[in-house]
């Protein structure tokens, strides 16, 4: 009898009784996906890469990143409109998405809500220098602020 009562109560709660509005779909709690203010084609290309922990080291790190252009990190164009990059601690790059957020921040990461643990936040981007930081605290500590300096003018 208790199982029958539980089943009936479960059914009633999904029907929206005593309400003039229909019940929300199960995933309605997720915020709608927002587009990033940076387009994938803006970051595709060859980049010198270095990182820093101390903000005072940023100018020196940009110079070091530029020096890495002889062995550039390549951000590729994905087949589904994203970019091909590495996730933290992954040897194989994969297609990631650029995602916007209600707070105005941009992220790069796998499909899912912006600012998820596997994402990296785009701290700044001016077309020539891209700075990212992993959302995951452990990855952020290990990798620091990643500085990408464009190696050559875009085609």
Question: What is each stretch, according to the model?
Answer:
Residues 15, 50, 72, 151-154:
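Small disulfide-bonded, cysteine-rich extracellular recognition modules and tandem repeats
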Residues 1-2:
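Bacterial N-terminal signal peptides that target proteins for export
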């Amino acid at each position: 009898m208790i199982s029958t009562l539980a089943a009936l109560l479960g059914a009633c709660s999904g029907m929206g009784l005593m309400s003039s509005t229909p019940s929300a779909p199960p995933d309605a709690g997720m915020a709608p996906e927002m587009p990033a203010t940076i387009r994938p084609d803006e970051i595709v290309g060859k980049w010198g890469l270095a990182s820093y922990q101390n903000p005072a080291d940023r100018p020196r790190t940009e110079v070091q990143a530029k020096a890495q252009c002889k062995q550039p990190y390549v951000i590729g164009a994905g087949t589904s409109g994203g970019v091909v990059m590495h996730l933290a601690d992954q040897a194989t790059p994969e297609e990631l998405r650029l995602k916007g957020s209600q707070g105005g921040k941009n992220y790069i990461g796998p499909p899912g809500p912006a600012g998820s643990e596997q994402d990296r936040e785009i701290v700044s981007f001016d077309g020539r220098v891209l700075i990212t930081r992993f959302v995951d605290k452990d990855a952020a500590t290990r990798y620091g602020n990643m500085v990408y300096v464009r190696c050559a003018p875009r085609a």
